[in-house]
């Protein structure tokens, strides 16, 4: 009789294979105290598995053409979104439904639209609820992985809407093999099949449907022409995706032992070591073959060798020895590289390598269990107390493994082909047109024309129509980006001007970009005893002057041709506010006599204007004075002298003097410059 420790191990072993069905019903104290820590292990492994979608996305986007990089990443996103919705509604129920009247060895029934009951009556029901959530999350992550495998097979050829529907159907197709292999009522579970981490129920299903899909869709345009060379758009992304998948498979294989308590942490460690040893064997074999065959290290050989070796070890990872994993991974790498020329010869266009990585490797992995499986005293129930051909010299386990592999291949291929056929005949359609394939899904499906599309246009010869369409899309994309950038710059400049204006008005100090403090003069406001000066647009705009009584003398002198400088001297007298100066007064100051309007009786402003010409120079000088009757209270003088590149005819004096000439039209076209904004002097300048 086994001791207490042995009974715990045996109880744990039962849970390892039966916890896939959450309602195990075991209520022994030994199992009860394992629930909590083991649930944490399962949930953590599920988180790691979800990161594999990033790896699939990078691997596939780096393997397809540049014009479809974004589209293939989007497909990996919808795999989780709509695939998860499909699994929640029906997939989990078909795999682990527990209604006795409807479930059978071939399909489960019940638990649709997953929502477990919350019965807090006993400890057993509480634990079962926790196991239910953990099991659902883990199985959901595995099911969406099977759907993601198919996305690489249909890359660049399937419509996005059609692929979303196909992904949901793949989830439902995968639900039945999961029931056969992992549910305690499953047909192959009862026969003693061994598949710890989804070699058959995940990778075999996704691989065979991917093969059927890529054959059904036919090769990409010009894929197998004599001058066609298949190149990765971004080998860097593909290698990064390989690393992420490498990391994620530790979560699948080590998490498939379903816990760490009761000695199962040793099983998790064994699965992790088997994973790394298989990848080492596969990678070393792929590198050797690449150097021998091509004298170079081919990136696709390296990726296929590593990933295919990990897939092949998933079925036996928890009971494998390190040298078992090394041999299994090496053989899987050979198969994955050997199948590549066969695919080219048969004109099977597999952009990402779904067939060598998932299909051939999963078949070999299931067969390897029947050869290398060793009975373990802690996992005796997992292998039904059977060993492989190498240890028992019996073909019994190998025969069960072959039966399971053949049944899943036939079922998945048939249902996958039926789904593809129905979708292709539906109004949605399945394959993109030749024109849409040339332009790329990034433009057609998402309206994107970024640098990846531009790079593809430069690298690939396109027809005139396609080139024009893509060029137009790229131009539109660049204009939109430039417009958005310009709007951001304008908004930033506007905010900066507002900040400076507020600082200028308040008289505070601000710091410029160099860290120096800028002191602004304080505007005259009513609070400090003076009225704020108001800016006028001048008579050229509204024919009126600001409501201030002004006494002004404007003197303009233009130097000779030797200097080309222009000097202005302006004297302004600010008086008490009076009514606006009538338009005819302003017109009399700037217009010739023949164009001046009649005198106004309401005007109390006098105008004096004279034009002088120095006898010693050709400089003309005009003095204009506008005065009003009230007494003067404040006088301020501002003198400015600055070079001006405008021609001399732009000044008001030149316009008036030249209007006297016959056939002169300068005054009709030259616009008087707007007056400058004036502010009273600061009697207390900053130190």
Curated annotation (Swiss-Prot):
It is found in: Membrane. The keyword Transport applies. Its main location: membrane. SUPFAM superfamilies: Ammonium transporter. One of its GO terms (cellular component) is plasma membrane. It comes from the Eukaryota. Residues 549-564 have a biased composition (Polar residues). GO terms for molecular function: ammonium channel activity. Residues 614-632, 648-665 have a biased composition (Low complexity). Keywords: Ammonia transport, Membrane, Transmembrane, Transmembrane helix, Transport. It is a multi-pass membrane protein. The keyword Iron does not apply. Involved in the uptake of ammonia. Belongs to the ammonia transporter channel (TC 1.A.11.2) family. This is Putative ammonium transporter 3.
């Amino acid at each position: 009789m086994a001791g207490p420790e042995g009974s715990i191990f045996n109880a744990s072993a039962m849970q390892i294979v039966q916890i896939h069905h959450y309602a195990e019903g075991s209520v022994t104290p030994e199992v009860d105290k394992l629930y909590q820590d083991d649930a944490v292990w399962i949930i953590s492994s599920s988180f790691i598995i979800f990161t594999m979608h990033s790896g699939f996305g990078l691997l596939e986007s780096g393997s397809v053409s540049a014009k479809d990089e974004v589209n293939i990443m989007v497909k990996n996103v919808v795999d989780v979104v709509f695939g998860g919705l499909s699994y929640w509604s029906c997939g989990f129920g078909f795999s682990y439904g527990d209604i006795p009247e409807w479930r059978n060895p071939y399909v489960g029934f019940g638990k649709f639209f997953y929502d477990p009951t919350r019965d807090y009556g006993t400890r057993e029901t509480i634990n079962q609820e926790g196991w239910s959530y953990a099991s659902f999350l883990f199985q959901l992550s595995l099911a969406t992985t099977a759907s993601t495998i198919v996305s690489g097979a249909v890359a660049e050829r399937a419509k996005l809407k059609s692929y979303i529907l196909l992904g949901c159907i793949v989830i439902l197709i995968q639900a039945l093999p999961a029931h056969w292999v992992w549910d305690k009522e499953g047909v192959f579970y009862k026969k003693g099949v061994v598949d710890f981490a989804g070699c058959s129920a995940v990778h075999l299903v996704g691989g065979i449907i991917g093969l059927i899909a890529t054959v059904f869709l036919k090769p990409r345009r010009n894929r197998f022409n004599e001058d066609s060379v298949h190149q990765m758009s971004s080998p860097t992304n593909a290698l990064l995706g390989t690393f992420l998948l490498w990391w994620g498979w530790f979560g699948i294989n080590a998490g498939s032992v379903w816990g760490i308590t009761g000695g199962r942490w040793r099983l998790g460690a064994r699965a992790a070591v088997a994973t790394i040893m298989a990848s080492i064997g596969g990678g070393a074999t792929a590198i050797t073959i690449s150097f021998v065959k091509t004298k170079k290290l081919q990136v696709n050989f390296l990726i296929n060798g590593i990933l295919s070796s990990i897939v092949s070890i998933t079925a036996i990872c928890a009971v494998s020895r390190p040298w078992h994993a090394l041999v299994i991974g090496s053989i899987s790498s050979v198969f994955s590289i050997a199948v590549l020329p066969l695919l080219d010869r048969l004109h099977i266009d597999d952009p990402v390598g779904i067939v060598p990585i998932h299909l051939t490797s999963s078949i070999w992995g299931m067969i390897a269990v029947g050869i290398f499986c060793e009975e373990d005293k802690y996992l005796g129930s997992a292998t039904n107390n059977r060993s492989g051909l190498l240890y028992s010299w019996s073909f019994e386990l190998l025969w069960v493994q072959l039966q399971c592999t053949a049944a899943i291949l036939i079922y998945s291929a048939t249902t996958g082909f039926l789904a593809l056929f129905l979708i292709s005949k539906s109004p949605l359609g399945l394959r993109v047109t030749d024109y849409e394939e040339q332009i790329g899904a990034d433009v057609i499906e998402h309206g994107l024309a970024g640098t990846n599309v531009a790079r593809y246009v430069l690298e690939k010869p396109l027809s005139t129509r396609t080139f024009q369409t893509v060029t137009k899309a790229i131009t539109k994309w660049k204009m939109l980006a430039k417009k958005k950038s310009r709007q951001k710059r304008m908004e930033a400049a506007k905010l900066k001007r507002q900040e400076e204006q507020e600082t200028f008005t308040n008289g505070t100090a601000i710091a410029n970009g160099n860290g120096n403090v800028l002191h602004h003069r304080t505007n005259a406001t009513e609070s400090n005893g003076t009225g704020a000066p108001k800016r006028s647009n001048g008579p050229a705009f509204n024919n009126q002057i600001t409501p201030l009584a002004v006494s002004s003398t404007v003197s303009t002198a233009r130097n000779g041709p030797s200097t080309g400088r222009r000097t202005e001297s302006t004297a302004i007298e600010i008086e008490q506010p009076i009514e606006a100066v009538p338009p005819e007064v302003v017109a009399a100051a700037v217009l010739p006599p023949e164009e001046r309007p009649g005198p106004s009786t309401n005007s109390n402003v006098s105008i004096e204007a004279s034009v002088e010409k120095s006898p010693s120079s050709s400089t003309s000088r005009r003095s204009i004075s506008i005065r009003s009757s009230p007494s003067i209270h404040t006088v301020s003088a501002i003198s400015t002298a600055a070079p001006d590149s405008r021609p001399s005819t732009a000044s008001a004096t030149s316009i008036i003097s030249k209007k006297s000439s016959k056939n002169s039209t300068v005054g009709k076209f030259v616009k008087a410059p707007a007056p400058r904004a004036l502010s009273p002097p600061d009697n207390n300048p900053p130190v």
